A protein has these predicted regions:
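Short His-centered aromatic/hydrophobic patch
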Residues: 66-72, 90
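Acidic anion/phosphate-binding donor-loop and adjacent secondary structure
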Residues: 122-123, 130, 136-154, 166-169
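Conserved catalytic-core segment of nucleotide-activated headgroup transferases in glycan assembly
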Residues: 152, 157-198
Length: 371
């Protein structure tokens, strides 16, 4: 999702982007080339490197930006041979073992999506702090218009959004155990094609609805009064003006306000701890649900503004483009030509005796050429 969002915006700004990946089902503007990074045998790795070098040469690629461990490994070697920068985005905790410390494969610079990942990379994998910069996963915030919660309905809709398997499934199950007896709530579970057997005990509860996989999550967020989730789900909920209780795979953040937003951002709303540990305080859950209904429209809008500054697609893309340009110049060791204009005049008659001027017409021609 994030790779396509970023590539579409880069293309919109006049860049040429090619996506190389195992699979890609999302619509995109970029050209797509299939390459099975998930195959990690030696012969497959060599083939990946050869293919990447061919793509780099044939398409005059200046920068490679990898978004997974598997693609980073092959890209590290291909970029080294090609003499171009590699940038990686690190979306989660990485395995900590000797081979990873020796061959880090984080490129010339890695972009952890939250502060806890950055701390993990520096402390546990020995990545230099100067080779990391935190940037959130970009979101096109205009797709999530602010809509204050509904106040007039007797039964409120609380939506738990995320998978029902793995660690997120364990969190969802615990949520149902605690909240299933709250009479004023309709609890919706959104996500997951298959419902694990242990959830069947909640089928008879009329206040609990298993929605399964849905295509239009933003629409379901609009219908809700409270959102429970982590990562992108929490961000989308806040942008949409909904109270959000952030609970991820690693941590219970609770009801998000401006007071605990920095803690939420650092952990990607509960999904990532800087150490490999879990930190849940389920005793706060029911109180957080009640408190969510007391948040004012002003408080929710202020929270949205602060989150928008962190995740806005245009802001993030601006920063990434500057990173691309800086690293390319450093890697290729190019000098940057500088043109200095002393004076711009409307007509040559205004030039004066020294004649150190340029006409506005000629200046405009220069700018158009440079662009």
């Amino acid at each position: 999702v994030y790779g396509v969002t970023l590539s579409d915006e880069l293309i919109k700004r006049g860049n040429n982007v090619i996506i190389v990946s195992d699979t890609l089902t999302k619509e995109r503007k970029a050209k797509y080339i299939k390459l099975e990074f998930n195959k990690r045998g030696l012969s497959e790795r060599i083939n990946q490197i050869k293919t990447l070098l061919k793509i780099i040469k044939e398409n005059d690629i200046h920068i490679v930006h990898a978004h997974s461990r598997a693609s980073s490994w092959s890209s590290q070697i291909a970029c080294k041979i090609a003499g171009i920068p590699l940038i990686t985005t690190t979306h989660g905790r990485q395995p900590v073992h000797l081979s990873r410390k020796i061959f880090k494969a984080f490129g010339d610079l890695t972009i952890p999506v939250c502060e806890n990942i950055q701390t993990h990379l520096i402390n546990e994998l020995g990545v230099s702090p100067k080779n990391t910069v935190v940037l959130r996963n970009p979101i096109n915030t205009i797709e999530y218009p602010f809509a204050a919660q509904k106040k007039d309905e007797s039964k409120k809709i609380l939506s738990i959004i995320g998978r029902l398997s793995g660690p997120k499934g364990e969190v969802a199950y615990k949520l149902l155990e605690i909240l299933s007896d709250m009479k004023n709530l309709e609890i919706r579970l959104i996500g997951g094609k298959d419902i694990p057997e242990k959830f069947q005990k909640f089928f008879k509860n009329k206040n609990i609805k298993f929605m399964g996989y849905v295509n239009d999550v933003p629409e379901k967020i609009k219908e809700s009064d409270i959102i429970v989730g982590a990562g992108r789900v929490a961000v989308e909920g806040i942008l949409s003006g909904k109270p959000v209780i952030a609970i991820g795979e690693a941590k219970y953040i609770g009801l998000i306000t401006n007071n605990n937003l920095s803690d939420a951002l650092a952990s990607n709303f509960g999904d990532i701890e800087f150490s490999n540990s879990e930190n849940f305080n389920w005793n706060l859950l029911k109180n957080d649900v009640e408190s969510a209904f007391t948040l004012t429209k002003k408080e929710l809008f202020s929270l949205r503004e602060n989150v928008e500054k962190e995740f806005d697609l245009n802001i993030i893309t601006d920063k990434i483009e500057k990173i691309y340009a800086r690293l390319y110049v450093l890697k290729r060791k190019y000098d940057i030509p500088v043109i200095m204009y002393h004076r711009v005049v409307n007509d040559e008659s205004e030039g004066g005796v020294p004649g150190t001027y340029i006409t506005a017409k000629k200046f405009d021609e220069h700018m158009r050429y440079l662009k």
